[in-house]
Amino acid sequence: MSARFYGVISPFITPFREDLSLDREAVAWLARYQAEKGVHGIFPNSTTGEFVHLSREEAVEVTRLVLEAVGGKVWVIPGISANYTEDSVALGRTFKDLGVDGAVVTPPYFFKVSPERLKVHFSTILEKVDLPIIVYNIPATTGINIPVGLYLELAKEHSNLAGAKATVESFTYFRQLVQVVKAERKDFAVLTGLDDLLLPVLMMGGDGGIMALANAAPQIHREVYDAYRSGDLKRALEAWHKLLRLVRVYDYATSFPTSVKTLLKVMGAPVKPYARTPLTPETREVEEKIAQIARELGLKI
């Protein structure tokens, strides 16, 4: 049985106007653009989408706009992360009613709970939300590194645990997800959250990634994915090296959201570079460095 979710998924940025209100037209445009450029799925209300800066109503509105824009062409898998378990449940049920394809959830990110309490948190959500759910490990922001053993327990006990997104730099962690959890549940998706690990994770037996730069240039990620899946390792390596050149954007920017928004701006997209405070737009100097990368790779709308 193949994984429920796979390939190239974008953690959707949230476009804002200069007054930091939602830019609904840009949301719809960007969702259509990503679908046309080859993403398999879109993850609104994400880390890159500044979900911690959105009200519940805004999270629902962005997800609704994305659903309408893509019209069923790609998966829509919104985030339901919250510090209170029942808030995640309520948001998941709301998204279920909207017609989404799944959901993504991180650990609580304020109180650092024990593995036992973390299992209760995820189990409650998996039991109460009737959707395929990706459990997202991002210790840099949550302060919690989800043990591989916990994924295994959840995978055995909850058939709607669809997989793991892991934003970690450890090859060992991904190897264990594949060899321990995926060996138990063949339909368990192993997804990287880091653009530059896409090919290594695929080669270890993973299924793809949910990567920030897929907001702007998912065609490069697709080139890596498609070449590897077709058995053309030479072409996959060439595409991966192109992706590694694009990843330099992160070397200059101050955050994932602003790096992507700046890249889209210099590519000519109708997406403004504004982010909600304490994040702020990148400086003109950073913008020019990112523009140079885009020019080198021939990226323009």
Swiss-Prot record:
Secreted recorded as keyword: no
GO molecular function, one term: 4-hydroxy-tetrahydrodipicolinate synthase activity
SMART domains given in the database record: DHDPS
InterPro entries: Aldolase_TIM, DapA-like
Keywords from the named record: Cytoplasm, Lyase, Schiff base
Active site: 47, 136, 165
Similarity remark: Belongs to the DapA family.
Record protein name field: Uncharacterized DapA-like lyase Tpen_1666
